[in-house]
Swiss-Prot record:
Protein name (database record): Small ribosomal subunit protein uS2
Gene3D superfamilies linked to this entry: Glucose-6-phosphate isomerase like protein, domain 1 (3.40.50.10490), Helix hairpin bin (1.10.287.610)
Gene Ontology terms, MF aspect: structural constituent of ribosome
Domain of life: Bacteria
Disulphide connectivity of cysteines: none
Source species of the chain: Prochlorococcus marinus (strain SARG / CCMP1375 / SS120)
UniProt keyword Repressor present: no
Amino acid sequence: MAVVTLSEMMEAGAHFGHQTRRWNPKMSRYIYCARNGVHIIDLVKTAVCMNNAYKWTRNAAKSGKRFLFVGTKKQASEVVAQEAARCGASYVNQRWLGGMLTNWTTMKARIDRLKDLERMESSGAIAMRPKKEASVLRHELERLQKYLGGLKGMKRLPDVVVLVDQRRETNAVLEARKLDIPLVSMLDTNCDPDLCEVPIPCNDDAVRSVQLVLGRIADAINEGRHGSNDQRARQKYS
């Protein structure tokens, strides 16, 4: 059975690419045509890629691989956090901080600092500090929660990075490739398919398209880990 149907992708707007002048010629193999100056993605090929991505991700999860979801643009942020949490993956959905992968030792220390501050807050230790000091600590806590909250469960580097917008997340792509971490990547018509191991050509700007793809990837991870793809926690985004 197909992982995703053509009607589901059409309804989600997964076929809409970027303006033709903004395309990457390497994506030509996944483009069906151009209409009114906009490239239309070939959803038959997207369906094939989704099947491949599902099987690849499921097998990776079955073998114990750890996943990191990355998508920091506004329309993807909530979906990234939701679907990563549903399948037990780590995530970055606000801003990619330089060195998140390539300077992992330093990043791990900052995550540990976040955990320490959370313990201090929950125990009342921060409230017992002088007002000014408590304010500084809470500001630090809020900032770390915003940018590193999705990484608290990540004990070491991920084995796979799942990416929403390749062009926006250039630094994440470069760091993953430098460390030979495979990328499962949504690819709009302005992307480079040569920069990922598992391509999924589709609209990476529409919330419903992002939800459809990440939802299936989360299903694959759950199936690989637990033998079933729990879809109960899925949400719909307008």
